[in-house]
From Swiss-Prot:
Subcellular location: Cell membrane
GO cellular component: plasma membrane; side of membrane
Residue spans of the Sequence repeats: 107-130, 131-154, 155-178, 179-202
Signal peptide residues on this chain, from the entry's feature table: 1-32
Region (4 X 24 AA tandem repeats): 107-202
UniProt cross-references to InterPro entries, sorted A to Z: LRR_dom_sf, TAT_signal
Lineage, highest ranks first: Eukaryota, Discoba, Euglenozoa, Kinetoplastea, Metakinetoplastina
UniProt-annotated stretches for the region Disordered: 231-255, 348-370
Protein name: Surface membrane glycoprotein GP46/M-2
Cell membrane in keyword set: yes
Annotated source species: Leishmania amazonensis
Length: 476
């Protein structure tokens, strides 16, 4: 039976559960012994495409050297293909065009997850990505990617999940995407789209679309109509189809639509290439701007180290960085040391940056995720007495939570947090999930800290980045 890697986003109790799938093969999922597990053609063509990403994201180019891509950071090789998983990074870069001299049937890239780059990733969605016939999961959530949805992506015959929430995308929703035979998840909320969800999307079997309600209402076509792309008086903006105008394309244009972080003037008509960076930034060969990282060194997942668990409840702080669990008071268990929720679990949204280290867009996105997590986990536990919930967090892992609220006078909540290692499966409620190994379990005893096992073949994360606190009704 196929071993699947799924990312589940649980909304409010009456909302639909969104499953992000990565079904890698019909054989047991296993990390390939190395690049040599692939054929010569697969090695050559996959390497060429990965090198295109390394050129577009300079920090990757510094480490992605040689030809043994299975040994590169942020890459996981399975027997059936390759996954690129960014985590705990402050890289900047753009989305590359796909190389022309590649046989894409031998490009074994199954998943691309660049969500952790946040506002450091800019550019537009390249139509040439339609060539990646094996791509199953694409996650660009929360990045600065802009432009429109390419109709050409309908040629992605293996695509199952496209996670494009909270970017800078605009335009209409392409009808042609409904022709993707395996597409199951399209997440588009938090963008600037116009028009309505196409009828062909609504009619497609098992397609789950996440987008604002005004794109689906009865008056959508009148209230949210798309305007013409060309404004009056701009007929001269489209250059003739000649090849003798190189000077025009290299002339900086100080337009306000530049999408490169830290850029003062974009290059020509491209919003994804910079000609001159602002003070404090330097221009790279890829026409991006490098400056002070959005998160200082020492931040990220490590910053949440030392988070504590408390049988009596959780102390929760809401700040600019989202939801954070207070550390010191959680060990003593003294009355009043920390507020006790009725039932449920509180998740720390990782990594919670310090105040002032994120822009307003990042803070808004974090608050939205905090609200979704709390409503997804705490509310069902209160309403139904027993809740099994799966939720997605910003680290490349999935947490399964089974919550049993206290019953009577002496029974306490039992919370089991299972961290995905992308190997094997475990049942989470009635739905299959890849929660393979138990990260931490504390039915009655107090723990001073959380210690996670190795996640997906060697990459280690702290439990504090996943689930940090278990709430319980007081005994007696």
């Amino acid at each position: 039976m196929a071993q699947c890697v799924r990312r589940l986003v649980l909304a409010a109790p009456l909302a639909a559960v969104v499953a992000l799938l990565l079904c890698t093969s019909s054989a047991p999922v296993a990390r390939a012994a190395g690049t040599s597990d692939f054929t010569g053609a697969q090695q050559k063509n996959t390497l060429t495409v990965l090198q295109a990403f390394a050129r577009a994201i300079p920090a990757l180019g510094d480490t992605w050297t040689g030809s043994d891509f299975c040994s590169w950071e942020h890459i996981i090789c399975y027997s059936s293909g390759v996954g690129v998983w960014m985590h705990n990074v402050d890289y900047t870069g753009t989305l590359p065009e796909m190389p022309a001299s590649v046989d894409y049937k031998d490009v074994m890239i199954l998943a691309l997850d660049f969500g952790a780059m946040g506002q450091g990733l800019s550019g537009t969605l390249p139509p040439s990505w339609s060539s990646m016939k094996h791509l199953i999961v694409l996650d660009l959530e929360g990045t600065k990617v802009s432009g429109t949805l390419p109709p050409e992506w309908s040629e992605m015959t293996s695509a199952e999940a496209l996670q494009l929430e909270n970017c800078g995308l605009s335009g209409s929703l392409p009808t042609s995407w409904s022709s993707m035979p395996k597409l199951r998840i399209v997440s588009l909320s938090g963008n600037h789209f116009c028009g309505c969800v196409p009828d062909s999307w609504r009619e497609k079997d098992r397609l789950d679309v996440t987008i604002e309600e005004w794109h689906m209402g009865e008056d959508c076509k009148l209230a949210n109509a798309c305007r013409p792309t060309a404004a009056p008086g701009t007929t001269t903006t489209n250059p003739p189809t000649t090849t003798g105008t190189p000077a025009a394309s290299s002339t900086p244009s100080p337009g306000s639509g530049c999408e490169v972080d830290g850029c003062e003037v974009c290059e020509g008509d491209s919003a994804a290439r910079c000609a001159r960076c602002r003070e404090g930034y330097s221009l790279t060969d890829e026409k991006t701007c490098l400056g002070e990282p959005r998160w200082r060194r020492g931040g990220g997942v490590e910053r949440t180290a030392g988070c504590r668990c408390c049988v009596g409840g959780c102390a929760v702080e809401r700040g600019a960085g989202g939801v954070r669990v207070r550390r010191a008071p959680l060990l003593c268990g003294a009355p009043g040391a920390c507020p006790r929720p009725r039932h449920g679990v509180v998740a720390a949204l990782s990594p919670p940056p310090a105040d002032g280290e994120t822009d307003s867009h990042t803070r808004t996105r974090t608050r939205r995720r905090a609200s979704r997590v709390l409503s997804a986990v705490v509310a069902p536990a209160r309403m139904h007495g027993h809740a099994e919930a799966c939720m997605r967090v910003r680290v490349p892992a999935l947490v399964c939570l089974s919550v049993w609220p206290a019953v009577g006078t002496r029974r306490r909540s039992n919370v089991r947090a299972a961290a995905v290692c992308r190997l094997g499966q475990r049942r989470c409620g009635a739905r299959p999930s890849p929660c393979a190994s138990v990260c931490v379990s504390w039915p009655r005893e107090r723990r001073t800290e959380c210690a996670c096992p190795a996640l997906f073949d060697g990459a280690r994360l702290r439990c504090c980045a996943l689930v940090v606190c278990a709430g319980a009704a007081p005994a007696g």
